[in-house]
């Protein structure tokens, strides 16, 4: 719930500092995207020093509404502040899920805009690396007509290991390093961000095996992605990508399917029978990764 800050029936907003226990942050009635943006703006304003800083800003919108997060008799619908509805001439009682979703995304866009405006006001934009992405593809579970996003032409969606669940767009900005308007068609994944920010801030990452690689050489167009393989498991789903090839299964006891993503990004043409050697190579790579975990 974007106003009560409840997830799975429990309060899910906390405030904590280093060396102190995390405590619940009760801001009932404040829209979550605004709450998170306010916290980020406060952090940025307080950290305008010569020391590097890092701000992780995980908005929860537009995550799908869920009845488990609602009060009895409360409608299971997209939520947005009044101004977001008014932008399109709608009332807060708008019944069309698609239009309510539009208001939710608009409110998120406004919140992000306020954070970016703060960077401008602090004179920090030109020396700040910004990376914005989704944690998964749009949900396509057809729940009560509220799943609005589209992953076309990719197969599947959030909480699956099909490309529609794994492959998401991202927006990056770093003036003087990443060319404005440039498009990067190279595979990266979220573990890359830890290494990237550590390198930018001269922080020392843990001396353990890390799966991330610095993303800036790729985003700036100076080098291709160094990734050879990507490993995924979520609940019963599993997948591994090696170059342009990918294996995927939706249950541990079912056979793997094999797809060549460059020519078949929609994962419609299973190549497992036609390419048994390639299938065996990817299964071997998957087991190697699985052993490490």
Segments the model singles out, each with a brief description of its role:
Residues 5-6, 231-233:
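Short solvent-exposed loop/turn micro-motifs enriched in small/polar/acidic residues
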Residues 120, 220-225:
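Basic phosphate/pyrophosphate-binding loop/patch that engages nucleotide-derived ligands
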Residues 158-163, 229-231, 237-238:
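Short Gly/Pro-enriched turn/cap motifs at secondary-structure boundaries
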Residues 209-212, 228-232:
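Short catalytic/ligand-gating loop segments at beta-alpha or beta-beta junctions
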Residues 215:
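Charged (Asp/Glu and Lys/Arg) segments that form or flank catalytic channels of large polymer-
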Residues 1-191, 198-209, 249-255, 262-268, ...:
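Active-site-proximal cap/lid insertion segments
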Residues 13, 238-242:
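Short acidic-hydrophobic surface loop/beta-edge motif
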């Amino acid at each position: 719930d974007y106003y009560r800050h409840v997830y799975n029936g429990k309060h899910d907003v906390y405030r904590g500092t280093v060396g102190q226990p995390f405590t619940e942050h009760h801001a009932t009635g404040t829209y979550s995207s605004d709450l998170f943006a306010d916290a980020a703006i406060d952090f940025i304003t307080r950290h305008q020093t010569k020391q590097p800083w890092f701000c992780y800003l995980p908005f929860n919108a537009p995550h799908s509404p869920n009845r488990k997060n609602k009060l009895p008799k409360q409608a299971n619908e997209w939520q947005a502040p009044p101004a977001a509805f008014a932008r399109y001439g709608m009332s807060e009682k708008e019944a069309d899920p698609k239009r309510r979703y539009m208001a939710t995304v608009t409110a998120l866009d406004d919140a992000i805009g306020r954070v970016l405006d703060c960077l401008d006001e602090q004179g920090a934009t030109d020396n700040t690396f910004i990376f914005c992405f989704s944690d998964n593809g749009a949900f396509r579970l057809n729940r009560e007509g509220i799943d609005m996003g589209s992953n076309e032409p990719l197969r599947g969606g959030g909480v699956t290991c099909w490309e529609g669940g794994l492959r998401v767009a991202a927006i990056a900005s770093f003036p003087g390093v990443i060319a404005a308007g440039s498009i990067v068609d190279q595979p990266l994944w979220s573990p890359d961000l830890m290494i990237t920010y550590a390198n930018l801030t001269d922080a020392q990452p843990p001396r353990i095996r890390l799966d991330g690689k610095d993303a800036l050489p790729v985003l700036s167009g100076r080098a291709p992605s160094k990734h050879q393989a990507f490993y995924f498991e979520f609940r019963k789903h599993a997948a591994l990508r090696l170059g342009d090839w990918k294996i995927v299964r939706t249950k541990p006891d079912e056979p793997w399917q094999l797809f060549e993503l460059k020519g078949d990004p929609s994962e419609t043409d299973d190549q497992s029978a036609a390419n048994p050697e390639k299938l065996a190579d990817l299964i071997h790579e998957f087991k190697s990764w699985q052993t490490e975990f």
